[in-house]
């Protein structure tokens, strides 16, 4: 049977033109592949949360849909139209959702009456996300009624629980539009893991609703669960999260959509080599300016971890522990500069460090005070990374062969210290380490290998499981991806495995290193969107067929 294809896709996410986490990368890297298939008929909808400022990821085009925007304004919708500044430059609409807060209670009441969604226990970001979601759905409805008709095959695709209210609104008010929901991580699964509960050992004993009550997550659990129940096609990003959906949301997914990568982000060889040298030189300068130690390119390994600041879930704690153990391993053949590139409650760039870095040629032989972080933090005394480093005695003394630095900011090229984007820094690495305890997919290891940096991850990450499947066995660093076995309780073994892998890699000769880097690049090419986009069209087909059946009865 020939698959149905959408004429238009409206895709909403809090991270459209709003770089917060991994979902931004999912959508931004996939955009070009969809643009090539259906140019300017994939329309992304994101939050206009920049106020009077302009989003650095959005290029406004006031002429785009000018006639519709007048109608939208009459309907109380304040939108900006333009292009998302990513490869493919897809159409993007940013909507101001603040005007709907005054209608919040009426919106939630309708949600309860029609779909049984409990918003009474809402707190934190629930209201903000829900009002955006409502606004995004209203934008889609308005655009549809202005330009389209029931003859068009239209998809409304929401990402994460934050878009659930909008999906249910479309289901209610625009049933001729097919709906699709992707959970990139169940909110209750992430919460169980983040609250130091053993997610995996007792997995089949967990009841999602019961755990939501215990962890004060009732409203997020409710909107996510009911959206999964009513949507035309329910999807997630990995087999491990598909198990979560079935167990904690009581709804098996229809399709698994593994996250791909668009390697147009990766520079060509000559530019790549130039940027790699620049990145390493900058990292060495930063480390010298902080500690007074000097670093030789042939005798220094750069190792990093990155991601959102979830100490246990992202494995930041076990990364710190593994680097600490490395300090006492006499088999280590090189110096190690280890970086934790995780945004925290950053106050400002260290002025003493900035002053030193302004001298591009001077080599320093004395350390700065407390040379462990590149930026000042609010409430440094309660920061978990700094606290763990202090407890372990990791002070980056000048003569320590292993040094760990906390880079607590978004690497967007304007942090005040490194002033390079994440992609322009990561290619300076020798290894990347992502020892996640909870990781539905894991974009960071995929990004690493795409930039020819071998990585260490775990079999609790969707990407790690996928890599094992591709390789046919547990991956090794020689093959570009070392996949470490991780459970609820083997923290110490994981720390040892990471430390030992770094030691082993430090002994590689030039030929072995080149082979490992080549293998990393090769495995990344098996995860290109050109290979994975077929799963999306499978999901679109499922959703469209259900919508067509509804149209027959309208």
PLM region spans:
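Catalytic cores of nucleotide-sugar-dependent glycosyltransferases that transfer UDP/GDP/TDP-activated
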Residues: 1-554
């Amino acid at each position: 049977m020939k698959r149905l294809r959408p004429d238009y896709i409206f895709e909403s996410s809090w991270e459209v033109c709003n770089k917060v986490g991994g979902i931004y990368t999912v959508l931004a890297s996939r955009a070009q592949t969809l643009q090539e298939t259906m140019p300017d008929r994939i329309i992304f909808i994101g939050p206009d949360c920049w106020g009077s400022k302009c989003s650095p990821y959005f290029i406004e085009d006031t002429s785009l849909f000018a006639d519709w925007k007048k109608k939208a304004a009459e309907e109380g919708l304040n939108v900006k139209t333009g292009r998302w500044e990513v490869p493919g430059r897809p159409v993007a609409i940013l909507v101001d959702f603040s005007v709907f807060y005054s209608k919040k209670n009426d919106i939630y009441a309708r949600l309860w009456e029609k779909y049984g969604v409990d918003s009474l226990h809402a707190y934190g970001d629930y209201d903000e996300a829900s009002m955006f979601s409502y606004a995004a759905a209203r934008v889609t409805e308005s655009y549809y009624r202005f330009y389209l008709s029931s003859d068009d095959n239209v998809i409304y695709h929401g990402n994460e629980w934050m878009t659930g209210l909008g999906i249910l609104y479309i289901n209610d008010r625009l049933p001729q539009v097919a709906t699709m929901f992707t959970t990139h991580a169940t909110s209750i699964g992430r919460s169980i893991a983040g609250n130091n509960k053993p997610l995996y050992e007792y997995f089949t004993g967990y009841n999602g609703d019961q755990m939501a009550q215990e962890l004060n997550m009732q409203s997020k659990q409710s909107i996510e669960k009911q959206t999964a129940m009513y949507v035309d096609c329910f999807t997630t990003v990995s087999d491990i999260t598909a198990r979560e959906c079935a167990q904690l949301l009581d709804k098996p997914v229809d399709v698994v959509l593994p996250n791909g990568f668009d390697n147009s982000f990766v520079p060509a060889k000559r530019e790549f080599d130039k940027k790699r040298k620049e990145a390493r030189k900058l990292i060495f300068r930063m480390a010298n300016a902080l500690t007074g130690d000097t670093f030789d390119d042939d005798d220094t390994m750069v190792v990093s971890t990155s991601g959102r600041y979830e100490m246990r879930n992202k494995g930041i704690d076990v990364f710190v522990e593994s680097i600490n153990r490395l300090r006492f391993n006499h088999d280590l053949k090189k110096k190690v500069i280890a970086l934790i590139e995780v945004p925290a409650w950053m106050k400002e760039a260290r002025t003493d460090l900035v002053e030193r870095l302004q001298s591009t040629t001077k080599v320093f032989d004395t350390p700065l005070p407390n040379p462990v972080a590149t930026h000042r933090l609010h409430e440094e005394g309660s920061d978990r990374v700094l606290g763990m480093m202090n407890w372990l005695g990791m002070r980056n003394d000048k003569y320590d062969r292993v040094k760990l630095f906390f880079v607590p900011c978004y690497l967007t090229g304007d942090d005040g210290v490194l002033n390079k984007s994440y992609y322009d820094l990561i290619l300076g690495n020798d290894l990347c380490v992502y020892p996640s305890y909870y990781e539905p997919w894991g974009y960071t290891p995929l990004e690493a290998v795409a930039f020819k940096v071998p990585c260490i991850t775990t079999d609790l990450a969707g990407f790690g499981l996928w890599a094992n499947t591709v390789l046919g066995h547990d991956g090794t660093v020689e093959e570009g991806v070392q996949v470490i076995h991780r459970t609820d309780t083997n923290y110490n073994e994981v720390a040892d495995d990471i430390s030992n892998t770094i030691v082993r890699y430090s002994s590689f000769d030039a030929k072995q290193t080149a082979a490992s880097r080549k293998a990393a690049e090769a495995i990344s090419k098996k995860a290109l969107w050109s290979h994975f986009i077929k799963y999306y069209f499978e999901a679109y087909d499922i959703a469209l067929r259900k919508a067509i059946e509804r149209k027959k009865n309208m």
